[in-house]
């Protein structure tokens, strides 16, 4: 069983935007520049279409970095149950076989990924992906 609160994330400008005029729009993994936060991004009715209040963020004046802090928002939580059923049978004194049935995400709970956190993106504030659905695995293990 795994239970986790949501992962923190940072709102930034699209990686191609060099709003601070430093000559470095991105370091290869996201935006260097951040927007200005003008209000609370918290929503009482967050959904995959609008995880946070996108209107709480605006482009800063050209040549500035913006005032949004690092990891100021939290994504969806994560809950997962994995289960394995094993049955071992002795074939001889030196050999055994093990039948395995394994279930990952047993209850098939939808665990959402982080929302799009880049101001200027058409999907800003939306969650567009989720972690894998339930997977079942049947195996036979021979030990000698």
Locate each region found by the language model:
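Short, solvent-exposed micro-motifs at the edges of structured domains
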Residues: 1-144
């Amino acid at each position: 069983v795994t239970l986790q609160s949501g992962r923190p994330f940072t709102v930034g400008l699209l990686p191609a935007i060099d709003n601070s005029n430093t000559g470095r729009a991105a370091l290869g993994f996201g935006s260097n520049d951040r927007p200005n936060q003008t209000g609370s991004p918290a929503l009482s009715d967050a959904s995959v279409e609008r995880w946070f209040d996108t209107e709480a963020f605006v482009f800063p004046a050209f040549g500035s970095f913006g005032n949004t802090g690092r990891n100021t928002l939290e994504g969806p939580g994560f809950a997962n149950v994995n289960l394995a059923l094993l049955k071992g049978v002795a074939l001889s004194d030196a050999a055994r076989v093990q039948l395995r049935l394994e279930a990952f995400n047993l209850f098939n709970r939808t665990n959402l990924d982080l929302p799009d956190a880049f101001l200027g993106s058409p999907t800003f504030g939306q969650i567009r992906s989720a972690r894998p659905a339930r997977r079942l695995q049947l195996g036979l293990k021979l030990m000698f």
